[in-house]
UniProtKB/Swiss-Prot annotation:
Primary enzyme class: transferase
Keyword Transferase on entry: yes
Cofactor: pyridoxal 5'-phosphate
Organism: Arabidopsis thaliana (Mouse-ear cress)
Induction (free text): By coronatine.
Keyword set includes Transferase: yes
Stated family: Belongs to the class-I pyridoxal-phosphate-dependent aminotransferase family.
InterPro entries named among the record's database cross-references: Aminotransferase_I/II_large, PyrdxlP-dep_Trfase, PyrdxlP-dep_Trfase_major, PyrdxlP-dep_Trfase_small, TyrNic_aminoTrfase
GO biological process: tyrosine catabolic process; vitamin E biosynthetic process
Gene Ontology terms: cellular component: cytosol
Name of this protein: Probable aminotransferase TAT2
Keywords from the UniProt entry: Aminotransferase, Pyridoxal phosphate, Transferase
Length: 414
């Protein structure tokens, strides 16, 4: 794999997507092509992805009750914390309590909390590559050294555990595991997660489990929470309502100590958590108050519909990728909302790298893809498939036209 020459600390996904949008000069109302974005992981951009009526009613009832217009406790409303503990406990061999749960403003704030709590002089953290660039941004702000562990596309984007052992030392504080995977669309097996836990225990660090895409698994492997292995190694579980309930703008996330052995039960650690949350601003109180109803009353049919839509969209992507020689995917998505495809520059006449590809594609075809450099892999592309079938079909038709326009001329051999 070719890794990004530009570190993700200098690039944000939203930043580069904004630049790509700005590069599109044609306007639809002036006869230009409709802009299709397969770059941002926000399913609400497409009408086929909508949250449940249960969620909407719960928030409406909470807001109109006039009971939740004031400040909430800094760690979150007790009833919301309790509901999240019960929700996560369904998939664990032990029960969480509300004291294990801290409510955050989206999963991004949970990431910042986790890294802030682990920061200390000379500490380092192991991050997956490709991954989510917010981790490196937060680490840099907290003066945490970042060490990258490559994911292996030939093995379904599994973590290279030999590399983990080679990179870790006495100052390694944690390994980040994103499952289901963003940006790769992978889902880790029980066996692989067990090996991760055993490696972390052996090497003496904890695991940060980013499960913002939790349960969004539509392949052959079911979603297994990292917290299942909490008795082997301490796990900090990060998650949110954003993806599974299709409400990223509600900013309701959680930071959870999935740790039945009690490593985080030290009064000094708990007090440090609470003091840090005292300086944070959590989600709106009325959103928190709706959480118990949302978690307890959402019908399973809603989740099945979402999974069916994501699988159908990912299948359309995979079928089209076979028709475009300059992009290739060795791994069919099994979950989340995105996938990585490799760019074959040798087949293109005047495209220098993944960033050049994406900017020229945006200008010429009004299609937005995310350059792999933004997530740590140069000359790869991240494609988000949380979109309707019509938009995906049209986007890939344009990508194919772009390829044909820029394909190297094949001269006949004499």
């Amino acid at each position: 794999m070719e890794n990004g020459a530009t570190t993700t600390s200098t690039i944000t996904i939203k930043g580069i997507l904004s630049l790509l949008m700005e590069s599109i000069t044609t306007e639809e109302d002036e006869g230009g092509k409709r802009v299709i974005s397969l770059g941002m992981g926000d399913p609400t951009l497409y009408s086929c992805f909508r949250t449940t009526q249960v969620s909407l009613q719960a928030v409406s009832d909470s807001l109109l009750s006039n009971k939740f217009h004031g400040y909430s406790p800094t760690v979150g409303l007790p009833q919301a914390r309790r509901a999240i503990a019960e929700y996560l406990s369904r998939d664990l061999p032990y029960k969480l309590s509300q004291d294990d749960v801290f409510i955050t403003s989206g999963c991004t704030q949970a990431i910042d909390v986790a890294l802030s709590m682990l920061a200390r002089p000379r500490a380092n953290i192991l991050l997956p590559r490709p991954g989510f660039p917010i981790y490196e941004l937060c680490a840099k702000f907290r003066h945490l050294e970042v060490r990258y562990v490559d994911l292996l596309p030939e093995n379904g984007w599994e973590i290279d555990l030999d590399a983990v052992e080679a990179l870790a030392d006495e100052n390694t504080v944690a390994l980040v595991v994103i499952n289901p995977g963003n940006p790769c669309g992978n889902v880790y097996s029980y066996q692989h997660l067990m090996k991760i836990a055993e490696s972390a225990k052996k090497l003496g660090f904890l695991v940060i489990a980013d499960e913002v895409y939790g349960h969004l698994a539509f392949g052959s492997k079911p979603f297994v929470p990292m917290g299942v292995f909490g008795s082997i190694v301490p796990v900090l579980t990060l998650g949110s309502l954003s993806k599974r309930w299709i409400v990223p703008g509600w900013r309701l996330g959680w930071f959870v100590t999935t740790d039945p052995s009690g490593s985080f039960k030290d009064p000094k650690i708990i007090e440090r958590f609470k003091k840090y949350f005292d300086i944070l601003g959590g989600p709106a109180t009325f959103i928190q108050a709706a959480v118990p109803t949302i978690l307890e009353q959402t019908d399973e049919s809603f989740f099945k519909k979402t999974l069916n839509s994501l699988k159908n969209s990912s299948d359309i992507c995979c079928d089209w990728i076979k028709e475009i020689p300059c992009i290739d995917s060795s791994h069919r998505p099994e979950g989340s909302m995105a996938m990585m495809v490799k760019l074959n520059l040798s087949l293109l006449e005047d495209v220098s790298d993944d960033i050049d590809f994406c900017f020229k594609l945006a200008r010429e075809e009004s299609v937005i893809l995310l350059p792999g450099t933004a997530v740590g892999l140069k000359n790869w592309l991240r494609i988000t498939f949380a979109a309707d079938a019509t938009s995906i079909e049209e986007a890939f038709k344009r990508i194919k036209c772009f390829y044909l326009r820029h394909a190297k001329t094949q001269y006949p051999t004499i």
